Amino acid sequence: MSNNVVTELAPTGTLRAAINLANFLLVSSRADNGDPQGVAPDLAAAIADSLGVGVSYVPFERPGPLADAAVEGVWDIGLIAVEPARAEHIEFTEPYVEIEATYLVSGHSDIQTIAEVDQPGVRIAIAARSAYDLYLSRNLQHAELVRAEGIDGSFDLFVSEGLDVLAGLRPRLLADVAQIENCLLYTSPSPRDRG
C-alpha cells in the first residue's frame, strides 16, 4: 500500500470508521468494551488492517447524523448506503452489500401492488433520513412520507397512527409483519407475504 493512500484514508495514523448503529443487519451487537460488532465494523477493521493502521470506531445512532458529520472531519470512512443527496459531501465506493427495502401495507388499505403506493392520500411511515427515505423523497410524487426517528420509531408511528404503509428494510419488515394482524409485505410487483 502506498504511503499516499494511507495518508489520504487515515491521516491521523488510525482509520476512523463511522458506523451506523441503526442498521441491525450491519451492526449486530457491542463488544464488552463498547465497540460495535458485525459486518460494518469487521469491514472497517479489514480496511485498516490492509492499510497497516489501527481502527477507531465512530458510532452514530442513525445514518443522517453520520452523513452530516462528513464535513466535520471526525471520521475517515463511513459505512452507509450510497445516496445522491449524501454524495454532495461524501465520495462513495462501489457498494459492499445490497439490502432490499420494501413496503409493509396495512390490512385496511386497498393497495394491491407497489405501484399503487404512490397515490394521493397514502401515508407512509418511514425512518427519517434513511437511504430509502432519501430515495422515496426523490421518486414519490403523490404519497405522503411521515417521518419518525429510527426503524423502531417508524414502526411505532405506523401502528399508532394507523398509517397505510410502512417503508423499511425487508429483513426487519419480515419480523414486523408477524407482529401486526392482516398486513401485507410487498416485493415488486405484487404482495408476497401475509402476516
What would you call each of these model-derived segments?
Residues 47, 69-71, 117, 157-160:
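Hydrophobic residues within well-ordered alpha-helices
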Residues 27-32, 44-54, 129-150, 178:
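Ligand-binding cleft/hinge of the Venus flytrap
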Residues 14-21, 37, 115-132:
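Short loop->beta-strand "edge-of-pocket" segments that line small-molecule binding or catalytic clefts
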Residues 64, 81-89, 159-185:
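A ligand-binding cleft/hinge motif common to bilobed small-molecule-binding domains
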Residues 3-81, 86-88:
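Extracytoplasmic small-molecule ligand-binding "clamshell" domains
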